C-alpha cells in the first residue's frame, strides 16, 4: 500500500537542519471502472529513528510501521500482520526530502552514475545508469527537473521496460527545502497499468516533542 514512497537507492549524507517529517496523507487508487478508492490518514518519519509510521482513519482505522525490512500492520493496537519489505525507511521519499536530495531522487549519493543529460525547453533530463551487477534488479532511471525542482521520474527494469512513472507537483518551500504535496504514480506490472495519486497536507518539518509518536516501540517477541 505504501511502497510507492520508497525505491532502492543507497543514500548517505544529511541535511543539517531537517530531521522530522509529518503530514496528513490521502492516497487515491484508480480502479478499473474509473472510480477512485481513497485512504486517508497521517504519516510521520524521523530520520534518527528510521521508522515510517502511517495512521489511517478512512476507510478504516489502521496503523502501519515500516521498519528495517518489514511492514507491520496494527488494528485496535493489536499486531495483525507482518510483511517483508526490501525498501528500508532510509530509502523513502521522506528521507530524501529531509536530506534535501529529492531534486535528483537521491541518485547523486547512490551507486548509479550519470550517462546522459539532455535539455529540452526548460527541462533537464538526466539519465542515470545502474552499476554493472547481474543481480541488480533495476535498469536506467530518467529524472526530469525544472528550475532545479524534480518534475518526474521514469524507472525501467533491466530489459528497458517501464516499471514506474512518477510526477511531482504542487511544491511548497518549508524549512529551507522544496517539498512536493502531490505525487502521481503509474506502475506497470505484468502488463497491468495502475494509478495512484498521493497528496500531503499540513506538512510539518521538525515537530518538537512527541518522540514516542516517531519512535514506535515494537515488541520483538511479536515478530
Q: What function would you assign to each model-found segment?
A:
Residues 35-42, 63-68, 160-164:
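Amphipathic hydrophobic-ligand
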Residues 1-20:
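Bacterial Sec-dependent N-terminal signal peptides
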Residues 46-96:
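An acidic-aromatic
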Residues 16-19, 27, 74-138, 214-222:
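Flexible, processing/modification-adjacent segments and terminal tails
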Residues 121-214:
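Gly/Pro-enriched, hydrophobic low-complexity segments
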Residues 27, 56-57, 74-78, 154-158, ...:
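Beta-turn initiation residues at beta-strand->coil junctions
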Residues 16, 45-47, 65-67, 74, ...:
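Generic beta-strand structural signal
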